[in-house]
Curated annotation (Swiss-Prot):
It comes from Arabidopsis thaliana (Mouse-ear cress). Residues 1-27, 54-94 are annotated as: Disordered. Induction: Rapid but transient down-regulation by wounding, salicylic acid treatment or pathogen infection. This is Uncharacterized protein At3g17950. Residues 1-19, 61-74 have a biased composition (Low complexity). The lineage of its organism: Eukaryota, Viridiplantae, Streptophyta, Embryophyta, Tracheophyta. InterPro entries: At3g17950-like. The gene is Y-3. Interacts with RLK902. Expressed in inflorescences, stems, rosette leaves and weakly in roots.
Length: 211
């Protein structure tokens, strides 16, 4: 005789075994809401809260937007009202030439690059050097205008030599050795006969003779 307290095994035609979720537990739990997932502690997806997804466009409150706009306008007006910092400076200091071919003796002793303009030495600019090249050119230097240009360079070079009986530092485009075994006379040594020698061209255009 079958015990009435022991449930019978389900058959294929039973209602409790028709659902996949309750097929394994239909023999013990005829309530279709009880599944293996609920026994393990999982809840239904319908009862779970949906995760909050933030929108791609960030929402800015009107008060924050107004404060940002006012701060940007105040900053823009402050920049317009600000006077230029270098307006009080004199014109020579404000438009200072940074390029120098040679060292000037009458510059500021502190190395600030301020030209005092005493007239002892004249600064040679890059524009003057390029103007000489444009004026004479390669063909003029090697042909008819060579003598004229050489005379100008040699004359300026001789004017810059000290009147103390010292000999020249350059000759024929090369640095002369020290006069240790020679007697120094007042006559200067011949300078270069061609402007194409780079040291001589530098010596001719330098204001103080020192690079």
């Amino acid at each position: 005789m079958q015990d009435p307290h022991v449930p019978s095994s389900p058959t294929i035609s039973s209602v409790s075994s028709s659902d996949l979720d309750t097929e394994s537990t239909g023999s013990f739990f005829h309530d279709r809401s009880i599944t293996l997932g609920t026994l393990m502690g999982f809840s239904f997806t319908a009862t779970m809260p949906m995760p909050f997804r933030a929108s791609s466009r960030r929402h800015v409150s009107p008060s924050v937007a107004i404060s940002r706009a006012s701060s940007s306008n105040a900053r823009r007006n402050h920049q317009r009202k600000r006077p230029p910092s270098n307006s009080a400076e004199p014109e020579p200091h404000r438009r200072r030439k940074w390029w120098r071919f040679c060292r000037d003796d009458d510059d500021d002793a502190a190395g600030n690059g301020i030209h005092r303009g005493t007239g002892d030495s004249k600064r040679s600019s890059l524009g003057e050097y390029l103007e000489v090249e444009r004026r004479f050119g390669d063909e003029a230097v090697y042909n008819s205008a060579e003598a004229e240009l050489e005379d100008a360079v040699v004359a300026r070079y001789q004017d810059q030599q000290p009147v103390m009986g010292e000999r020249a530092l350059f000759a024929d485009g090369r640095v002369l050795p020290p006069a240790s075994a020679e007697v120094v006379t007042g006559e200067g040594t011949p300078v270069a006969t061609s402007l194409c020698r780079f040291p001589v061209s530098l010596t001719g255009i330098c204001s103080g003779g020192g690079g």
